[in-house]
A protein has these predicted regions:
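Sec-dependent N-terminal signal peptides of Gram-positive bacterial secreted proteins and lipoproteins
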Residues: 3-21
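N-terminal beta1-alpha1-beta2 submodule of the flavodoxin-like/Rossmannoid cofactor-binding fold
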Residues: 22-105, 115, 182-193
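Second-shell loop/turn segments in exported
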Residues: 34-41, 108-111, 136-143, 170-174
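Helix-loop-strand module that forms the ligand-binding subsite of alpha/beta enzymes
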Residues: 71-161
Length: 193
């Protein structure tokens, strides 16, 4: 019986990996400019992590780009994000995912801002039908790990299957490509991909 279960799990993992690229999307929000613990960067920490995930899975990419940019300065961005959290704001973003229905697996990436998912990511989640989709969160942080973002996504998307997410320190995503690639590879392997 154990051999049969192992065989079936192996087949399921191979099938999932083979079909992942065709039906997978990596969508993410990232902040360039001044980032905590990494300084001023041209490409945000989460963008770097998202691109590694897309490269390793063959998934398509969609960046959640705000209509109104967040301030480049860390302190000003902190003030803007805190105000959004306090007010429950839903900032608008540019463009949208083409052919949403073709994607079965959605990776959702974001930085953890003061223990929370940035509100613009909630805008994206609330604007799309995730029923029947597999959602895989990932985030960058500087000490808070996933915070409670896994639970928040599960609560926001009750009709989706939410798999275990990945948390990578922003400084690692920004400055250590090898460690980031290994963290992603290990995580995907743990998910059976």
């Amino acid at each position: 019986m154990k051999k049969l279960i192992s065989l079936l799990l192996g087949i399921a993992m191979m099938t999932m990996g083979a079909s992942l690229a065709e039906g997978a999307l990596v969508t993410y929000f990232s902040h360039a400019g001044e980032n905590y613990n990494v300084g001023v960067v041209e490409e945000g920490n989460t963008a770097k992590l998202a691109k590694v995930i897309a490269e390793q899975t063959g998934a398509d990419l969609f960046e959640i780009v705000p209509v109104v940019d967040y301030p480049q300065s860390y302190d000003e961005c902190l003030e803007a994000a805190t105000a959004e959290q306090r007010e429950g704001a839903r900032p608008e973003y540019m463009g949208d995912v083409e052919n949403w229905d073709q994607y079965d697996t959605i990776f959702i990436g974001y930085p953890i801002w003061w223990g929370e998912i940035p509100n613009i990511v909630y805008t994206f989640m609330e604007n799309h039908d995730f029923a029947g989709k597999t959602v895989i969160p990932f985030n960058t942080h500087e000490g808070s790990g996933q915070s409670h973002s896994q639970r928040d996504i599960e609560n926001t998307l009750p009709d989706a299957t939410v798999l275990q997410g990945l948390a990578v320190r922003g400084a690692t995503a920004q400055n250590d490509a090898d460690a980031t690639a290994k963290a992603v590879s290990d995580w995907l392997s743990g998910l059976g991909m």
